[in-house]
Regions:
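Sec-dependent signal peptide cleavage junction
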Residues: 17-30
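Bacterial N-terminal signal peptides
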Residues: 9-18
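Aromatic (phenylalanine/tyrosine) cluster motif
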Residues: 17, 89-92
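Structural signature of tandem-repeat unit edges
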Residues: 31-38, 48-65, 75-89, 98-112, ...
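Bacterial N-terminal signal peptides that target proteins for export
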Residues: 1-9
Length: 131
């Protein structure tokens, strides 16, 4: 009886777990490396050289909803960043070590800013959060 129950449990796990997994795909568009799933796009890296960066509202036709951990980390070039309305998450150390970053505009849609998101941003003077 115990063996049958264990086998049944194993079969249920094998069938159910793949159904609950979130499929994430990675892409590159211009200077942006990003991943996406059914909820939207997460910016994984900015590979450009602009000093004034405006994060696009959409990439690959999908809404940008998150800035991933370390996405801009250690970027010595950027001075200003503007995030689009719709972004609701800024990941751990997303902008850490951006020594030239002076100003960032964070939309009111952001509900989570993880630890160390702006650690060692020694030039950061202005954080604007429009209503």
């Amino acid at each position: 009886m115990k063996k049958k129950l264990l086998w049944l449990l194993l079969v249920v796990c094998v069938v159910i777990f793949p159904l609950t997994a979130k499929e994430t795909k990675a892409e590159t568009e211009g200077d942006w490396k990003y991943s996406y799933d059914s909820t939207g796009v997460s910016i994984d890296a900015y590979n450009g050289t602009d000093e004034n960066v405006v994060v696009p509202e959409k990439l690959g036709g999908k809404d940008v909803v998150a800035i991933s951990c370390y996405a801009f980390s250690q970027n010595e070039t950027i001075k200003t960043v503007k995030l689009p309305l719709g972004v609701d998450y800024i990941g751990f150390s997303a902008f850490s070590g951006c020594n030239s970053l002076e100003e960032i505009t964070i939309p009111s849609s952001v509900t989570v800013i993880q630890d160390n998101a702006f650690r060692n941003c020694t030039s950061l003077k202005t954080i604007e959060i429009p209503e």
